[in-house]
């Protein structure tokens, strides 16, 4: 047992720590490998920024200002974690249409995101041609994707094979929903990746619904990760609403691929908080009670609590971050809406190559 003096000193130290916490957050525990306090706070900011971009997209759609929106609410932790597990400027991302958080965490700006939604002429992804969230930013290592479900998985595996053949230390991250795993091209890509031992990480963001089809009606096994064994590489499951847990799993898979040890299938168990897209109504296949229960799995307050428990953030800092993110989204919206749309003169741009033939 401690002496009265030791107990008093411990009490005073605790009180002092409480005062420090109220004035400025202090790190009280060791942090995950590769993540500093500043990086963790930045990851939280990216999650909040994505949520506000998502909310704005659906509001603009309901106002008739943009034609379509796809939500990533409930996926933010898995996507941001995956982005930070990669080596920025070296590793490639082959995303799918629900990857707003991944894009915003890997170099896409809110202005660029909103330009895409408004389909403006100077939209950097496709000059207003593609569906929203069909990213293509080669200079930031974000590959163009296809609207055909799971087609991009085969493309990504081909990229990974090319990097291996060139002996480049590059890892390719390919993301998709569990609905994609019912497509033939997904299985072709997995089989090819296993045979050729390519440096790829497959990230399945399993939100349990392929539009309106629940997982139990599209899979005979409980987990997507269970399928990896048939292709000769590991399958790992993680809680996709836990950003730190997901980071650890994806980071390990990335480093494994970089060392030449082959593919990994990571299944992040997430949830979809809203309808599939702005053209869907989830109340036709989900009960209001089911939808309300999902709020308890929200990754943003969960990560905020984790950061607060470790002295990395406090309520004031959280409020300031949300205010900053909201201002950034407001600016992006006003700026993007004011940009000119494509005209007939732009019809054949990006169709034919320009410049000398030689």
How would you describe each model-predicted region?
Residues 40-42, 86-87, 128, 259-261:
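A generic structural signal for short, non-catalytic loop/turn and secondary-structure boundary residues
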């Amino acid at each position: 047992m401690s002496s009265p003096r030791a107990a008093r000193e411990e009490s005073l130290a605790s009180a002092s720590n409480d005062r420090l916490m109220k004035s400025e957050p202090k790190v009280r525990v060791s942090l995950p490998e590769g993540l500093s306090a500043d990086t963790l706070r930045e990851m939280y900011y990216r999650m909040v920024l994505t949520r506000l971009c998502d909310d704005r997209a659906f509001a603009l759609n309901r106002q008739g200002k943009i034609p379509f929106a796809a939500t990533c609410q409930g996926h933010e932790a898995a996507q941001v974690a995956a982005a930070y597990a990669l080596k920025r400027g070296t590793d490639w991302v082959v995303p799918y249409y629900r990857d707003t958080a991944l894009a915003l965490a890997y170099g896409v700006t809110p202005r660029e995101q909103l330009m895409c939604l408004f389909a403006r002429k100077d939209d950097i992804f496709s000059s207003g041609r593609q569906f929203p969230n069909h990213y293509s930013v080669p200079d930031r290592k974000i590959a163009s994707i296809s609207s055909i479900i799971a087609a991009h998985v085969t493309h990504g595996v081909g990229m990974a094979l090319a990097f291996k053949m060139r002996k480049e230390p590059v890892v390719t991250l390919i993301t998709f929903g569990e609905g994609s795993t019912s497509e033939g091209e997904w299985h072709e890509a997995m089989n090819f990746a296993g045979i050729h031992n390519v440096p790829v990480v497959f990230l399945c963001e399993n939100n349990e619904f392929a539009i309106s089809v629940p997982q139990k009606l599209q899979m005979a096994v409980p987990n997507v990760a269970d399928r990896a064994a048939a292709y000769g590489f590991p399958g790992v499951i993680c809680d996709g609403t836990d950003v730190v847990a997901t980071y650890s799993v994806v980071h390990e898979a990335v480093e494994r691929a970089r060392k030449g040890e082959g593919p990994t299938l990571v299944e992040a168990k997430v949830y979809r908080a809203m309808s599939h897209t702005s053209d869907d109504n989830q109340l036709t296949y989900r009960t209001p009670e089911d939808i309300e229960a999902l709020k308890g799995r929200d990754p943003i307050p969960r990560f905020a609590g984790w950061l607060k428990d470790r002295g990395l953030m406090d309520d004031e800092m959280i409020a300031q971050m949300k205010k900053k993110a909201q201002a950034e989204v407001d600016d992006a919206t006003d700026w993007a809406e004011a940009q000119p749309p494509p005209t007939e003169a732009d019809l054949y741009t990006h169709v034919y190559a320009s410049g000398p033939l030689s």
